[in-house]
Amino acid sequence: MERCRSGHHRIISYYLSSSLILFWCIFVLVLLSTTSTTNALVKIPKNTTVPAVIVFGDSIVDAGNNDDMITEARCDYAPYGIDFDGGVATGRFSNGKVPGDIVAEELGIKPNIPAYRNPNLKPEELLTGVTFASGGAGYVPLTTKIAVGGIPLPQQLIYFEEYIEKLKQMVGEKRTKFIIKNSLFVVICGSNDIANDFFTLPPVRLHYTVASFTALMADNARSFAQTLYGYGARRILVFGAPPIGCVPSQRTVAGGPTRDCVARFNDAAKLFNTKLSANIDVLSRTLQDPTIIYIDIYSPLLDLILNPHQYGFKVANKGCCGTGLIEVTALCNNYTASVCPIRSDYVFWDSFHPTEKAYRIIVAKLLDRYLNRFF
């Protein structure tokens, strides 16, 4: 803004009124904010624009939306964020960047996707994307209640509506529609439903079978994607569940003395993924628009876990934080838990969430496999 004023101030002021100067500066700011600000690693076709990355879901893509909440599902303290910019704990459930950040970086949009509820969020950040995701969220309403304070998906949509209104105030309705239509929407959810709801609460298993519960999850996921489509989104990635039975905490709790992957947890994840994939296919055919895509995250993460050395990892059955067996959120802290010296040796940061290195490998694979379906 200052550069706009200082370089040509005398000439501009001679020809234009101060109000027009202000308008011109705001226009330039908006233009720059909706143009790639980092070098794109993923090549997209010429004349194709991806102005923003907009994210919904759970702790995998939360960037700090829970930071001011009274909840166990928050991590705005060290050692979380030890490898993030400046070594700051922002509320990301990892040692560094999370998938939303990496997607935006790979597309050349910006280095990080900020949390929508960050009180220090700059207005121009809205133009290039935010995350509404919240640790503890799930497709089944009960799941978020278990987290005591997480933001359920319906509330994430309410924040999204608020976000749209803010965009309209900044750039007008026409530009807002363009941003929503051409942005990449990322939805990652489902792990908490299976691990923290179905397999943790006996009353849930009295009411549902694994088949009926995963069907409920898949139906709610389809409804969520359809709602985003109704808001004008046309590039929607809906991620399936990961191999939950192979994350360190679940191996510790239910994997027996040898901490094996828990087959029934993985089977539930695969069943959900099958139902979700079918639901997304039906939705795409119903809308006659193939711009809602199911993303298989199960296979690439499982490959890292089963074949860590092929990707430069040394440890895949424990997290880097503490003993690596059970530490997550409050148990992963600077007072009672040490941190492994070489984070890049580990697939998992804590007992539930991967390291930035693991996320980077997975995101690169997924973008290479799926992104061209939009263009």
Swiss-Prot record:
Flower buds. Glycans are attached at N47, N334. InterPro entries: GDSL, GDSL_lipolytic_enzyme, Lipase_GDSL_AS, SGNH_hydro_sf, SGNH_plant_lipase-like. The keyword Glycoprotein applies. Keywords: Glycoprotein, Hydrolase, Lipid degradation, Lipid metabolism, Secreted, Signal. Its EC number is 3.1.1.-. It is found in: Secreted. GO terms for biological process: lipid catabolic process. SUPFAM superfamilies: SGNH hydrolase (SSF52266). One of its GO terms (cellular component) is extracellular region. The active site is at S59 (nucleophile), D350, H353. It holds the Pfam family Lipase_GDSL. Residues 1-40 form the signal peptide. GO terms for molecular function: lipase activity. Transmembrane segments: none annotated. Belongs to the 'GDSL' lipolytic enzyme family. This is GDSL esterase/lipase EXL1. It comes from Arabidopsis thaliana.
